[in-house]
Amino acid sequence: MAWLTHRPIGLTHSESGSDGGYTLFSSVRGHHASIIDPQGQIVHQWHHPEGIQHVKLLANGHLLIQTLPPADAAGREKIGGSAGAMIELDAEGNTVWEHRDITQHHDYVRLDNGNTLYLAWELMPQAICAQVRGGHHHDDDPELMWGDVVREIDEAGELLHEWRSWEHLDFNEEVICPLESHKEWTHANSLEVMPNGDWLISLRLTSTVILVDAGSGDIKWRWGGSQAHNEHDLKRWGPAELSHQHNAQRPANGNILVFDNGCHRKRGPSYSRIVEINPETYEFVWSYSNPTVLAFYSFMVSGCQRLANGNTLITEGASGRLFEVTVDHQVVWEYISPWTIPSPFGPSPAVFRSYRIKADDPRLAGYALSAANYESLNTAIAAGVLQTEPDYHEPETQPTL
């Protein structure tokens, strides 16, 4: 989405019909994470000196953050979404657990047994790289491409299991978009664990969502990509309807919900939308896009969340816009992130993802949530004063978040 140089920040719209509750978010490459109330007032913050890429509130009420990669991270390609560590913070910001892996990226899940799943990159064998289709080549392409891996570690950080995507993906089905580079194959950007333990993974570069059998590692279900070439493929995998999507998930109704970013669409302009499909029939159940098509677009990051009352919280990530829509597409709540952070694209308000939390959620029991604790900050935001952070050294990042 394009925006005015002097645009409003903070809460810009609220009306009846919102699901209410608190909203958790952080700025991409910032050093803070915030909880805001329905009025857009900051009621709690965490800070971390290593920077923050992504945050999630755990079942125990702690915050699990993914930090920025270290500037001197030798042996790691500088790819968008890269991280350095997962760090668990309590309500006061104290570190209670951490795991460092400079190949981790984008997303992670704390399991009920205390183990943690996360996405990582690994260089693929030359024989595999030679078979990857699509993308455009440059003279400076690396000899080996990066492939996606899912790792499971225990509470001590010991590796228990590792799934290498290239051992299960089909070269003819996972074809890189022709407008993307040949540096990596799939660029996974979201990971969700299904009720039966299987993994739902979004693959950005091939515009595909896959369901992985957690036991065998096989691909059980697939949506999108370049596979819908004939009637057999269409029946097997569904229509190719996605374009560099993020945040694939399964709402309580069993459907699949996705933020479809919309870069490099085959026909027409680039625009974003939220899409919900029935995974059995691939039929569209619900979708959201702006009637003024170009008014809703994020070329990177972004997400969505189905709320208890049926509304959907949407993170239009590149512009830092968080908004809630009803089933009938009415916007009932909107908030613009007040932070701008140094980035490869200039000062950026980007938010990777946001999460709505009910006011009576037991995970908040240990928090003294109060706008009064951040009175001066809330006053400045209400007055339209942009919040900035000092410049800091950061490795170059590809625009493929």
Range-by-range predicted roles:
Residues 1-401:
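Histidine-/acidic-rich catalytic cores in large beta-rich domains
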